[in-house]
């Protein structure tokens, strides 16, 4: 029978529930357990696919093509399980399914209510996502006390009642602030958030206290007394330089022993050797490189979370401190293509994105990298931008652009593909009036790499599988012209469309761009060959 750990948060949002939950999962996995994780989001959006990155941060794409919360990226980076669409759902999805059942008559004319119909659907989805695992860690988004979270909290209250204390555990994160003016740690917010939980029938088994300093013993005793939690189950989650220090930090306080005892799990001792090696590599780099990330969401770096982590992973595996400088492509555009801020950079990266804002600034950055032999990595839109720049400035295609930015451009080298065959053989059609939500090329796709190409050299294989998230594709009608001008198409999709997947420049020290998102499959234990190669290229440029 699967055991459940429910992770909630109180006082304020952005406490790090996802990191705490993933760290617990990593510790339990090191003890020989088969662990999965679920994220339950209280918002009414069906998924975050059409939400602004400034509001939601990154959209993480699973192997099976679900657009999910960025916390699922943390889950995959901390444990070996691959997330699927079953590992994430929102209020919108729950209501959508319940309403569809009502319309079909599944409820036999009964009155459809939050309890039991909505809560039953939530429980059904939790059990579905947890099936086949020893332990499922379920993170409830939002903050306890929010109206939006109530159906989810009621559902897990029912699960405790139905499954019992030895099969369920509640871990609650709370903020314990230090008031500098008073010189004191304040426990009152934690007392109030636990009171809020008790009012809806939830008693935390573990309290994880987010703090910027070590918790004094007397404050720990005070929290235990007022919150009715064992003193040893008051666990500190302190500010650290790297999130990969968190598993060891929580393990050192015995959190896994508390969990295994309550859930009656007879398992081996934790082995965090791999995590210790990762932390040691982060703390003891031998080299340093500066990489410019030129994008339009740079004011909220959470928009590029997986990408930032993938570069850090490459740093771990090359013993390098990867220093990322975020460059707003709009500023380049406003300053008439001034890229002087890139001159001290060892490499340049243009990430994915949507819309025309800041595009010409990105094109200027690509031009600088190409003309000055600076290592360049383009991802998704970053590949399309590189291709547009090459089409304009090298292949001589005047008016080259993407129809995403200019529907009537003279040379649409990137365009909306209006028809293709999906993995199951059905034909998808798209046009300008198609709904935005769920209408992209999503999830893992097969890619064939050209023998002798930089792509094949990086991956060490002629066939790879990478995750995608985009609507627009390179227009194959222009490929012969671009190839005649020296552009190398190093990878194409394995389907009948033969869509362009990677491009490279043979006469450049290191110039590579891909339509897919390799950052979604990087983790600190293994890294990713593409990012490792990119950081090595930056190191070589630095030495030169």
From Swiss-Prot:
Entry-linked CDD domains: CTPS_N, GATase1_CTP_Synthase
Similarity comment: Belongs to the CTP synthase family.
Protein name listed in UniProt: CTP synthase
The EC number(s) this enzyme carries: 6.3.4.2
NCBIfam families: PRK05380.1, PyrG
Misc note: CTPSs have evolved a hybrid strategy for distinguishing between UTP and CTP. The overlapping regions of the product feedback inhibitory and substrate sites recognize a common feature in both compounds, the triphosphate moiety. To differentiate isosteric substrate and product pyrimidine rings, an additional pocket far from the expected kinase/ligase catalytic site, specifically recognizes the cytosine and ribose portions of the product inhibitor.
Gene (UniProt): pyrG
Region (Amidoligase domain): 1-265
InterPro entries from the UniProt entry: Class_I_gatase-like, CTP_synthase, CTP_synthase_N, GATASE, GATase1_CTP_Synthase, P-loop_NTPase
Keywords: ATP-binding, Glutamine amidotransferase, Ligase, Magnesium, Metal-binding, Nucleotide-binding, Pyrimidine biosynthesis
Pathway note: Pyrimidine metabolism; CTP biosynthesis via de novo pathway; CTP from UDP: step 2/2
Known regulation of activity: Allosterically activated by GTP, when glutamine is the substrate; GTP has no effect on the reaction when ammonia is the substrate. The allosteric effector GTP functions by stabilizing the protein conformation that binds the tetrahedral intermediate(s) formed during glutamine hydrolysis. Inhibited by the product CTP, via allosteric rather than competitive inhibition.
Binding site for UTP: 13, 186-191, 222
GO BP field: 'de novo' CTP biosynthetic process; CTP biosynthetic process; pyrimidine nucleobase biosynthetic process
Regions crossing the membrane: none
PANTHER family xrefs: CTP SYNTHASE, CTP SYNTHASE-RELATED
GO molecular function: ATP binding; CTP synthase activity; glutaminase activity; identical protein binding; metal ion binding
List of catalytic residues: 380 (nucleophile), 517, 519
Annotated binding of L-glutamine, by residue: 353, 381-384, 404, 471
Annotated source species: Neisseria meningitidis serogroup B (strain ATCC BAA-335 / MC58)
Binding residues annotated for ATP, in chain numbering: 14-19, 71
């Amino acid at each position: 029978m699967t055991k459940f750990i429910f992770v909630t948060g109180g006082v304020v949002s952005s406490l790090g529930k996802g990191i705490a939950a993933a760290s617990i999962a990593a510790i339990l996995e090191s003890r020989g357990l088969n662990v999965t994780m679920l994220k339950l989001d209280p918002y009414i959006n069906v998924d975050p696919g059409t939400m602004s990155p400034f509001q939601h941060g990154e959209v993480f794409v699973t192997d099976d093509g679900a657009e999910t919360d960025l916390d699922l990226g943390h889950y995959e980076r901390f444990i070996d399980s691959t997330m699927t669409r079953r590992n994430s759902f929102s209020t919108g999805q729950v209501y959508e399914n319940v309403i569809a059942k009502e319309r079909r008559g599944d409820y036999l004319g009964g009155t459809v209510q939050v309890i039991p119909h909505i809560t039953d659907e939530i429980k059904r989805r939790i059990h579905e996502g947890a099936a086949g695992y020893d332990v499922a860690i379920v993170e409830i988004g939002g903050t306890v006390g929010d109206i939006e979270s109530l159906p989810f909290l009621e559902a897990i209250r029912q699960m405790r009642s139905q499954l019992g204390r030895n099969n369920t555990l509640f871990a609650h994160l709370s903020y314990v602030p230090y008031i500098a003016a008073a010189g004191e740690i304040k426990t009152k917010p934690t007392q109030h958030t636990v009171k809020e939980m008790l009012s809806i029938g939830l008693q935390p088994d573990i309290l994880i206290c987010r703090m910027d300093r070590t918790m004094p013993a007397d404050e720990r005793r005070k929290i235990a007394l007022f919150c009715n939690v064992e003193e040893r189950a008051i666990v500190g989650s302190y500010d650290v330089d790297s999130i990969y220090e968190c598993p060891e930090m929580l393990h050192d306080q015995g959190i896994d022993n508390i969990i295994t005892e309550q859930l009656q799990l007879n398992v081996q001792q934790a082995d965090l050797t791999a995590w210790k090696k990762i932390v040691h590599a982060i703390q003891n780099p031998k080299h340093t490189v500066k990489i410019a990330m030129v994008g339009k969401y740079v004011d909220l770096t959470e928009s590029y979370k997986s990408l930032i982590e993938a570069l850090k992973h490459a740093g771990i595996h090359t013993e390098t401190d990867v220093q990322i400088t975020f460059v707003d492509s709009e500023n380049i555009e406003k300053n008439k293509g001034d890229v002087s801020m890139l001159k001290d950079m060892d490499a340049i990266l243009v990430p994915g994105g949507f819309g025309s804002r800041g595009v010409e600034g990105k094109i200027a950055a690509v031009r600088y990298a190409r003309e000055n032999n600076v290592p360049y990595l383009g991802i998704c839109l970053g590949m399309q931008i590189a291709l547009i720049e090459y089409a304009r400035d090298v292949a001589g295609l005047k008016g080259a652009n993407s129809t995403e930015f200019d529907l009537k451009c003279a040379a649409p080298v990137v365009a909306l593909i209006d028809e293709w065959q999906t993995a199951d053989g059905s034909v998808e059609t798209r046009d300008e009036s198609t709904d935005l939500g769920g209408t992209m090329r999503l999830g893992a796709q097969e890619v064939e790499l050209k023998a002798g190409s930089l792509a094949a050299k990086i991956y060490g294989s002629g066939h790879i599988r990478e995750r995608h998230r985009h609507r627009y594709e390179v227009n194959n009608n222009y490929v012969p012209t671009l190839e005649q001008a020296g552009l190398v198409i190093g990878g194409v999709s394995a389907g009948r469309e033969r869509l362009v997947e990677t491009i490279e420049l043979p006469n450049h020290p290191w110039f590579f761009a891909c339509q897919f998102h390799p950052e979604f499959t990087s983790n600190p234990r293994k890294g990713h060959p593409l990012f490792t190669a990119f950081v090595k290229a930056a190191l070589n440029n630095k030495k030169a």
